[in-house]
């Protein structure tokens, strides 16, 4: 019988404090059927990104958290609880390391050998670090990206423009709503009907069809009427994109969010159904991969042709360019990455995906914090628009949560305000505050977050390690360090942190340090690389950088 996991709600504790109750609830929330892509196999999102190595490990993590003291720390090695040590009340309650390999051995083939032997787990970014909040977790980032495209090329709106993309998984599933929130039209190609149904059920997608002509008719009608619309097409991008080129149908914008970072489990070859692909993947993985590589080449060549014919194209951080390049598409990197093209300046001033979740399970706690963030930053019209859109459009998945992009100084101010609300009893229960690893100073990923750095420091991985250590030193509740998130094994290293606002004076001190230092290092990382906006931000917030003194 399949296990159904959901986080407890309310104020009754299963653990000895909220500092240990929080990681337990968020681990469980990652596996809520409303949240996780494949909870029966502990897979949360992003190909095979897991919350725990196996069910035995999951049970033992929960059991250990229930008995953990306020001066003890649980160590988790790739989803397996390996030790509890006496530390201090300032130390994190949980330290997590997922998927990390010595660089020479950091490739999918060797990783899978270790995974088969039960020695390692792919944690993606927020799957194995227990702070995934459903598709909303990437929604604002996707919204911001398409807004940046609109601002750069189309006068600040996507009205009357259409986007072609593929992949409606837990990350890509944000694309339809992000485009329509920017008043555009999107055709999203997806081969797995379950993913289309999931996006329809969560309100991220308007409609679907399995007929290309019908899909194009809907798209073209909406474009003509300047009416926002999202259409999913049950098909394969490697079949559809070349066909569009052949017909001379060129979108305004083209991107991709298939899970191409993991070609074996995240990409389906052209010319076959999803069910046929699953069968071949299991019976002959080598043949499967050969067909994937052929399909990726067709897929990227079609996007390159669309680019030549005027489409604005970008890779959305799934490493599909590298995959195509390795299999013969030598101009694959003519497609720019989305971070240097649209997001870098936000990162340079410390803005990134700040998120929080209501441990009570009560949506009112989130609505009250929504109100608070707007009170604190009344000058930010873009933030107000986002919160209002999110309240109208975003359905809860698991524990109620919110995401918004806040910068240096803002995160700490808001975190302290939340803690005060908990202290005064304005919220039913404590709030957990975290972020995606995809943030300003917590990732080294030369094909995504750190692509085309001004000083050429794309592959320098000291920064995410410093980020993890700094968050430990500052008092985060749990801290994680992962390998391979977003772009796949061998291509990224990244750190995450989560902190609990439980209304105590100790939490106040920790929040002030963690939410200042975590993002502060991101500003420092970009200032060190020579970005003027980061240097100005560092000076404005009195960040001490000896080499700039």
From Swiss-Prot:
Source organism per UniProt: Thermosipho africanus (strain TCF52B)
Functional description taken from the UniProt entry: Catalyzes the conversion of urocanate to 4-imidazolone-5-propionate.
Pfam families from the UniProt entry: Urocanase, Urocanase_C, Urocanase_N
UniProt keyword Acetylation present: no
Catalyzed reaction equations: 4-imidazolone-5-propanoate = trans-urocanate + H2O
GO cellular component, one term: cytoplasm
UniProt-listed PANTHER family: UROCANATE HYDRATASE
Cofactor(s) of this protein: NAD(+)
Main subcellular location of this protein, as a coarse class: cytoplasm
Stated name of the protein: Urocanate hydratase
Pathway assigned to this chain's UniProt record: Amino-acid degradation; L-histidine degradation into L-glutamate; N-formimidoyl-L-glutamate from L-histidine: step 2/3
Gene Ontology molecular function terms on file: urocanate hydratase activity
SUPFAM superfamilies (alphabetical): Urocanase (SSF111326)
Record carries keyword Cell inner membrane: no
């Amino acid at each position: 019988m399949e296990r159904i996991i959901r986080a407890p709600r309310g104020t009754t504790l299963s653990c000895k404090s909220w500092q240990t109750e929080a990681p337990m609830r968020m681990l469980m929330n990652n596996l809520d059927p409303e949240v996780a892509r494949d909870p029966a196999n502990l897979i949360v999102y992003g190909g095979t990104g897991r919350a725990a190595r196996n069910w035995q490990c999951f049970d033992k993590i929960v059991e250990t958290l229930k008995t953990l003291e306020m001066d003890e720390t649980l160590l988790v090695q790739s989803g397996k609880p390996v030790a509890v040590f006496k530390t201090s009340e300032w130390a994190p309650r949980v330290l997590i390391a997922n998927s990390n390999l010595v660089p020479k051995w950091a490739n999918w083939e060797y990783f899978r050998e270790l995974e088969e032997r039960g020695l390692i787990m792919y944690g993606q970014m927020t799957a194995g670090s227990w702070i995934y909040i459903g598709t909303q977790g990437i929604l604002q980032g996707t919204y911001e990206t398409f807004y940046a495209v609109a601002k750069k090329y189309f006068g600040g709106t996507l009205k009357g423009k259409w986007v072609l993309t593929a992949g409606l998984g837990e990350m890509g599933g944000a694309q339809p709503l992000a485009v329509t929130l920017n008043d555009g039209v999107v055709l999203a190609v997806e081969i797995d009907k379950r993913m289309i149904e999931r996006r329809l059920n969560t309100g991220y997608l308007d409609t679907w069809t399995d007929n290309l002509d019908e899909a194009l008719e809907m798209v073209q009608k909406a474009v003509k009427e300047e009416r926002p619309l999202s259409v999913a097409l049950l098909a394969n991008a490697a079949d559809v994109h070349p066909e569009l080129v052949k017909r001379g149908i060129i979108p305004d914008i083209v991107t991709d969010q298939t899970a191409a970072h993991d070609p074996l489990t995240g990409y389906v070859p052209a010319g076959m159904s999803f069910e046929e692909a699953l069968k071949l993947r299991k019976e002959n993985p080598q043949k499967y991969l050969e067909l994937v590589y052929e399909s990726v080449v067709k897929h990227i060549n079609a996007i390159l042709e669309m680019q030549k014919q005027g489409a604005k194209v970008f890779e959305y951080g799934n490493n599909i360019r590298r995959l195509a390049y390795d299999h013969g598409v030598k101009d694959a990197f003519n497609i720019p990455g989305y971070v240097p093209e649209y997001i870098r300046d936000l990162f340079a001033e410390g803005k990134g995906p700040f998120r929080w979740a209501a441990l009570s399970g009560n949506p009112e706690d989130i609505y009250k914090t929504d109100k608070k963030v707007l009170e604190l930053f009344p000058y930010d019209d873009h933030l107000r628009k986002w919160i209002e859109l999110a309240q109208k459009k975003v359905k809860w998945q698991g524990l109620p949560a919110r995401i918004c992009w806040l910068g240096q100084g803002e995160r700490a101010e808001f975190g302290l305000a939340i803690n005060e609300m908990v202290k005064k009893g304005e919220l039913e229960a404590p709030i957990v505050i975290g972020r995606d690893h995809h943030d300003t100073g917590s990732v080294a990923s030369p094909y995504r977050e750190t692509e085309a750095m001004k000083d050429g420091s794309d592959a320098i991985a000291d920064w995410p390690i410093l980020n993890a250590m700094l968050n430990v030193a500052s008092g985060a509740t749990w801290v994680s360090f992962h390998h391979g998130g977003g772009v796949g094994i061998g291509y990224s290293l990244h750190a995450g942190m989560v902190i609990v606002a439980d209304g105590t004076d100790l939490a106040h001190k920790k929040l002030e340090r963690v939410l200042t230092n975590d993002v502060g290092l991101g500003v420092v990382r970009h200032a060190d690389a020579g970005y003027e906006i980061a240097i100005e931000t560092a000076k404005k917030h009195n960040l001490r950088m000896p080499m700039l003194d």
